[in-house]
Amino acid sequence: MRIYLRTFGLCIVVALLSLVFLFSKHDEGSFSAGFKQVRAPLQQKSFNGAKAKQRPTATTSHRDVVQNPNSPVQEEVLMHLAAVACGERHGEVVNMLKTAVTLSQRALRFHIFAEQQLQTSIKADLDSWPAFIQGKFSYVLHPISFPHEHHEEWSQLFKPCASQRLFLPMILRELDSLLYVDTDVLFLQPVELIWDMLMLFNSTQLIAMAPEHEEPRIAWYSRFSWHPYYGKMGINSGVMLMNLTRMRITQFKNDMTPVGLHWDELLMPLLQKYKLNITWGDQDLINIIFHYNPEMVYTLPCHWNYRPDHCIYGSNCAPAEDEGVFVLHGNRGVFHSDKQPAFRAVYEAFEQYTFGEDLRQSLLSRLEVALNETTHTYCGKASHFFTTGLQKSVRRLQRATPPGD
């Protein structure tokens, strides 16, 4: 009788352990593991035939549209640049990509996350660029994609689609490194200069970002935030250079669990804890994460993410004064309003530039004339910082281009 009872008890224990295992796997798949691995082949591909283990749990299947199928460029030399476009961001994202491909000499692959209605127009613009420009880049169009269970919450955090960038390490699983920028960004220096900063990371660093402010008297986080933030004045998420491999495997310290959590395990609990205390959405979550993990951040100088706050109350970005602006970030819509005409002048100069025209005459000289009309504003008085960086880029390109090409 005892033998039967022991056997019965053992069966019960095995059954309970099996149930626990099954539920744990279900919970794991419902949030992070279900993100589909997005490949970036050099030819158009459908994911309908993907294996079951790669099945996406996001609301929309991923679709690749990659240009230049016969490009000889090797995968390992590509610089990967990502952006997220929703709403009225079509013009911005195309202009941002235009600045990147105009000033860079290395091959680029663009990863563009966009709503379905924007994908067609973005594709049409990129496909219309001349062949000598298309030979410098390839691109992948991705749909906006969030975990099923919390899609609505993530998609409406701060601005529509803004929090998509939080999920890039899980979606772009085949990539080792990535440069993410907001759509309202213009490159005034080649992408390779910031991309090469990956080699400057030490053994603990996995992301490079610029401070939110340089001047404590106008800093948001140190004066108004109701949550932890990185460093003395926080960091800005408009430009992020990421080692995705490290981000996927690292366990992040936090104030919720005694042990570290992986990136994909951390995001939802963090939002649930702080959603009533955050103002700037996903940027605030990033600040909270790196408040507890400051050793993981490589600090970019402010001229790699130059915003109106760096000049609107007087110049407060010393690297820009010394070397010029390298990346211009027109946040708060200043590229499309009259609030900061100097920022708008740079945006319109690139927008009106035609590929193949002389950069000095058709871009730089016209921009200098337009900026001279903005000197009645604080940022207009500092607008020579904008052209200093661009002049360096133009000279570099002209030296690299043989006469007659």
From Swiss-Prot:
It is a single-pass type II membrane protein. It comes from the Eukaryota. InterPro entries: Glyco_trans_8, Glycosyltransferase_8, Nucleotide-diphossugar_trans. It is found in: Membrane. Glycans are attached at residues 202, 243, 277, 372. It catalyses: 3-O-(beta-D-glucosyl)-L-seryl-[EGF-like domain protein] + UDP-alpha-D-xylose = 3-O-[alpha-D-xylosyl-(1->3)-beta-D-glucosyl]-L-seryl-[EGF-like domain protein] + UDP + H(+). Its main location: membrane. Belongs to the glycosyltransferase 8 family. This is Glucoside xylosyltransferase 1. It comes from Danio rerio. The lineage of its organism: Eukaryota, Metazoa, Chordata, Craniata, Vertebrata.
